[in-house]
Amino acid sequence: MGQKVHPNGIRLGIVKPWNSTWFANTKEFADNLDSDFKVRQYLNKELAKASVSRIVIERPAKSIRVTIHTARPGIVIGKKGEDVEKLRKGVADIAGVPAQINIAEVRKPELDAKLVADSITSQLERRVMFRRAMKRAVQNAMRLGAKGIKVEVSGRLGGAEIARTEWYREGRVPLHTLRADIDYNTSEAHTTYGVIGVKVWIFKGEILGGMAAVEQPEKPAAQPKKQQRKGRK
């Protein structure tokens, strides 16, 4: 039976950046890894309704810097920054070093695999038909410029006695092409019949410059120059 490698893991260092970017010696490595896990667990619990896509952790000079990618930055920040200050203190307590929290907005949540998977799971928990939820997610992603998308759900679909897997795909999703920018993520819907797993693959195009092209900040689109019309004297 054929098995699939994790689409994000195989592309790390090729077209995908790491979610934790720090270096440590042998003594500190395990502690840093443990605190990273606990920080992510804490933030995902506190920001369960804030549409968090990914959490990036850096450790510059005995401190911790956390960047939260979210589709709803207002919920993370709170009134006058109260909520983000509470999060900063919580992260500092867990990590044991001074903490800094940055917020990055996800402009197109329909093209983010984690947010799409979470959206489908929330619909399944509200008893929306699974086929309708899948097709809606696929249509929204393709409408906003995805080159391809595949959505898979598995479990007791529609309350059936026997669990099964169903999937829906549109466009191209080339899993073997390493330069392909494929966003992959999973989520779980906890229904009265049991857990339903959701997997989402979104193909956004090919990255030809490798990591150098990924890490370059996007340049603003150049404004076309207006031609001056010469008036008659």
Swiss-Prot record:
InterPro entries: KH_dom (IPR004087), KH_dom-like_a/b (IPR015946), KH_dom_type_2 (IPR004044), KH_sf_prok-type (IPR009019), Ribosomal_S3_C_sf (IPR036419), Ribosomal_uS3_bac-typ (IPR005704), Ribosomal_uS3_C (IPR001351), Ribosomal_uS3_CS (IPR018280). One of its GO terms (biological process) is translation. GO terms for molecular function: mRNA binding; rRNA binding; structural constituent of ribosome. It comes from the Bacteria. GO terms for cellular component: cytosolic small ribosomal subunit. Pfam families: KH_2, Ribosomal_S3_C. SUPFAM superfamilies: Prokaryotic type KH domain (KH-domain type II) (SSF54814), Ribosomal protein S3 C-terminal domain (SSF54821). The keyword RNA-binding applies. Keywords: Ribonucleoprotein, Ribosomal protein, RNA-binding, rRNA-binding. Transmembrane segments: none annotated. Residues 39-107 form the KH type-2 domain. Coiled coil: none annotated. Belongs to the universal ribosomal protein uS3 family. Binds the lower part of the 30S subunit head. Binds mRNA in the 70S ribosome, positioning it for translation. Part of the 30S ribosomal subunit. Forms a tight complex with proteins S10 and S14. PANTHER family: 30S/40S RIBOSOMAL PROTEIN S3, SMALL RIBOSOMAL SUBUNIT PROTEIN US3C. NCBIfam families: rpsC_bact (TIGR01009). This is Small ribosomal subunit protein uS3. It comes from Cronobacter sakazakii (strain ATCC BAA-894) (Enterobacter sakazakii).
